[in-house]
A protein has these predicted regions:
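Molybdopterin (Moco) oxidoreductase catalytic core of the xanthine/aldehyde oxidoreductase family
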Residues: 118, 126-129, 141, 153-154, ...
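Active-site-proximal alpha-helical scaffold in enzymes
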Residues: 75-105, 134-168
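Single conserved hydrophobic/aromatic residue that forms the stacking wall/gate
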Residues: 183-192
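Conserved beta-ketoacyl condensing-enzyme motif
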Residues: 17-85, 91-114
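Condensing-enzyme catalytic core mediating Claisen C-C bond formation in acyl metabolism
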Residues: 1-19, 147, 156-157, 190
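Ligand-binding pockets and gating/stacking loops
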Residues: 168, 174-179, 183
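Short acidic alpha-helix initiation/capping motifs at coil-to-helix transition points
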Residues: 23-25, 132-137
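Short acidic, glycine/proline-enriched helix-loop-strand junctions
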Residues: 109-127
Length: 192
């Protein structure tokens, strides 16, 4: 089997921008191609997805209609990761040598207004707050912590490290380190 490498990366700065989610995705794709010193015409495949900013294959007319197959991936918040895994296996299998993987999204301000029925879930799921990602993931991490003996302190340190890393990244949404004592305020969801 073939070795697989990520040879280029691109990212659009986080934040509120007037451009569409698709525009932001194309920005990141062009940046990744440039970073790898390759052209769109060099790509043998593309996997991409977006939960709410349109179909990733809508990039084709703007990147170039060169016959490259572009496969849409949909897996909610994990769409980008699932696209990456798909691209990995496309190369690892030996079927292709080089491809593009992208994931992008753009959400309106405020809480997500997902409808449980669209996801095959009962109404009580939303009524109890489980359609809100903060509540859902807070409950999920609490269960994971209990099952595997992960301490509260460990979780807080992960958040601290993430903020520190964000302070080093010019494209990050939050670029200010946050002290452990502030992160520790609100168990289990925390303000950060």
């Amino acid at each position: 089997m073939t070795e697989v490498y990520i040879v280029g990366a691109g990212i659009h700065p986080f934040g509120r921008h007037d451009s569409t989610g698709l525009d932001q995705g194309i920005f990141a794709v062009r940046q990744a191609l440039s970073d790898a010193d390759v052209d769109w015409d060099d790509m043998q495949f593309a996997f991409g997805g977006s939960n709410s900013a349109g179909s990733a294959d809508a990039m084709l007319p703007r990147l170039g209609l060169n016959g490259t197959q572009f496969i849409n991936v949909a897996n909610g918040c994990a769409t980008g990761g699932s696209a990456l895994l798909s691209g990995y296996w496309a190369i690892k299998s030996g079927e292709f040598d080089m491809g593009l993987v992208t994931g992008f999204d753009k959400h309106a301000r405020g809480a997500f207004a997902a409808k449980p029925k669209n996801y095959g879930l009962p109404e009580w799921y939303a009524e109890t707050g489980l359609m809100m990602t903060t509540q859902f993931f807070a409950m999920k991490i609490k269960r994971y912590m209990d099952m595997f003996g992960i301490t509260d302190e460990s979780l807080v340190r992960v958040a601290e490290k993430a903020f520190q890393n964000g302070s080093l990244a010019p494209h990050a949404w939050r670029r200010t380190p946050v002290d452990l004592s502030l992160i520790h305020i609100s168990e289990p969801t925390r303000p950060y």
